[in-house]
Amino acid sequence: MVSLSLLIAIIVVTGLLAGFRHYGSSRCRTVPFKIKSRSIEKTASTRLLGMSLEDAMKRYPLFNFYPGQSIREILSSWERVTYGNGETIAAPGFILQGLVEIWYREHLVCVKEKGSFLNGSMELLGYSTRGTKKARGSVEVLLIDASLVRDNIWYILFSMLRKSCIEIACRYFELESKLVEKETMKIKDDGQGHLDLFLSFLNEKLLLNLDDGKEILRRDIEARLIGRGETIKDSEESMDYIMYVVSGEILVLAGESAFVFGKGSVFGYFSLFFDLYSSIKIQAREDSSVLLCSSSVLLKFGLDEKKFDHSMLLDIDESLHIIDESAEWMRLLPGDMIAQKGDASKEIFYIGAGSVKSASRESSSGTVIGGKECIFGESWNESSIATRITDVVRIPSLLVDYFLERDKSFFKKYTKRLFESGNKANGKIVSIIPVGQYKDIESFSRKLKSAIGASSLLLSRRDVVEILARRAFDTTEEVRFMDYLTKMSRRYEIILIYVENEYSRLLRYLLNFSDVLLAVGTTFADIPEYNVYCRIEFVKIYEERRASDERSVKKSKKINHGPRYLESRKESFGQYDRVHHVLFPSKTMLFCSKDFQRLARSLLGKRIGLVLGGGGARGLAHIGVIQALEEEGIPIDCVGGTSMGAFIGALYAKECNNYHVFKQAKRFSRKMSNIWILLLDLTYPICSMFSGHAFNRSLHSIFGDGLIQDLWLEYFCITTNIVSYEEEVHRNGMVWRYVRASMGLCGYLPPICDNKKLLVDGGYLNNVPADVMMGMQVEKIITVDVGTVLENDHFDYGDTLSGFTILFNKFFGNKKFVTMEEIQYRLAYISTERKMKELEANGNIIMLRPDLGKYRTMDFKKFDEIVACGYQSTKNAIAKWKQEGTYDVLFFSLKKQTPKRRYSV
């Protein structure tokens, strides 16, 4: 017996020691997690239809009213009731199995299925329901104690009322006029001053219990004089204040309704709790005086959601109760699938906050998904998933049908709002972390914030912790944090959040709310692995401006026997969707903000793309175009091109220095106009006139073995694949080889062999590839077309033509004959002309066509003339834009952000 006890004691002690060792080792060693970007084509984690209880607990914040309970505890301690077909369900609950119909009078407004709540927020607040819930077949329901909900998660319950009832009613069912009418209040003048009257009203109505704080609040109330016709608040602006009319009359326009508030009126009570007046317009009907008090001021004096008078909602409109009982608020996790391609459309999804992505579009807060499919009874034409934590409200199609039947004009109003919602811009949330040995993430973040300007908000780890009240992983606080970010995103275009530790638990938390993760470092390094659906971009820091050569291929003695095939995107960028090169801090420049401004434009979606067309020596005009753009302060964020445009574009992308472009292009032109170099490269013309060796050496001497993905600017070039008869877009690989392939004019140079492909001049299929640039998230595209041949006054030589005739005419005649290179470029332009006509209709594409009619394809010896022609043509075009007023329209977003500069830096 003693030996048995001793044995048990030894086992227990050994286990404890092992546990301590494990605990100690885990404390001393940080276990990294990897951040891995997931594409929407992959299977999403959870679908919304028919969710299990386990999945629903993670996605319905309402389940947090008894935190810490497991599924087994919930199923064992909560009451489960089975209802037969047609039975009425009176209590609130969650559907474990079956279908439940919700009827309003004689109308079926909703059918809820497994994985849904039966009740709306008003029922949980203790008010009687207006609809009737009936079981369709056998239904199993998990009943909910409403008093327990009210006691434990009041904020979540209030959020449910706001998100799935009030906000939907105002934005898509046009009930804001009912709310405006209901909240109209008047203060009776009892002889006190207007300010004292307003303070007394706020104290009593909002239950503030000011006492000693009344004098402090008095100083925070704003008095404003408003002239007749002056706008106080425009539509699409948020309203978060309550207003007292001291004198005059205030006109409130809500949809098709108009309300007039006279002396003593108070308006804006609902706006203190809900963001529902964004669509109304407020202006002075006559000269007026008003007092304003914002919600941010009242929060300091104890205003919170528990002090909202819910009874004000009871008599507004019966539609509000129907919406509350039918619509459902859910909080999706990154990767959750809203709809799968081919599914029948039964619901409309309103995105309250967050982001949802499909193959063709990305939808953010304030937009609707599935509206068209629901109205016209179509199936989903593509799958959609949440890319971060996203608030969605499920609106059943039966509810829409009810409103269509009730109001014949509803279809027109609803569809108008449905399609208008997709145009609303919302702030982007960007998390910033250091990787590798880089530590100065705070300075980087502040510099980026400065480049973006007043339209950005910068938050540190400490700021986030304060917002969360040190309860970062509580569901209620997560909902509060989401609401805070949503409110800020309506005020700011970018919210920057930086975290000093890449292995921080807070980072895991923030990634679920982020649209973009910026990894900042001096060298390419793997970042921690963790599955996320947001964009992951890398910012590589330099101390001097130079073309990156970190991943360049080692030089080969024989240029034509180097690496042959294109690197895959995975090998080139690894985990990153985009790579930015940033000079910070600069060893050679005191103030260097050009790269930060470029990064800022990328995050804001305001990038400027430059597309350079092919045209042989005429392409030298691109140098003058770039110089003119730089002098006018028009930035270039990414470059693409074909043939000669690919060459000039690569030169500029390499160092962002137009002097470097000028110098290297002139050196190249000298070689191309040197008859001896050309003669030495002649070969037996079975495949081509020249072997291409001299041409290759010229390009290699300029670009070396650098890679496209290491160029300072994002770059691409176009080639024609004569094996598959398709155009190829090259975004990575060796620069000189793909520039050479893009310049490979058939008959002159042999095709480039690339992984069983034969690549020739890209101009045959796409001479000005603006369509490719359109897919690179740019706001404006400047295209330069130098290949257009405007002159057609060639001599009619008949059916045959001798080359000796052309040669003789060159010295002793003045007739104009068509040449081989001109024929090549005219052929190339046949397929391009159709694309150019389509692009001209796009308002975001700016077309430049320098007058180069007198210059031929091989006129490299006229380098200075052609460059000057491109420069002057661009300066004239910009002067014309300014005279016509189109310059401000085209580049308005760059005015305050990008300073005018004289030199490339």
Swiss-Prot record:
Subcellular compartments: Endoplasmic reticulum membrane
Extent of motif DGA/G: 761-763
Cytoplasmic side: 22-905
GO cellular component: endoplasmic reticulum membrane
Motif (GXGXXG): 614-619
Ranges of residues in domain PNPLA: 610-774
CDD domains registered for this protein in UniProt: Pat_PNPLA6_PNPLA7
Binding site for a nucleoside 3',5'-cyclic phosphate 1: 198-319
Active site annotation, chain numbering: S643, D761
Family: Belongs to the NTE family.
Protein name: Lysophospholipase NTE1
Source species: Encephalitozoon cuniculi (strain GB-M1)
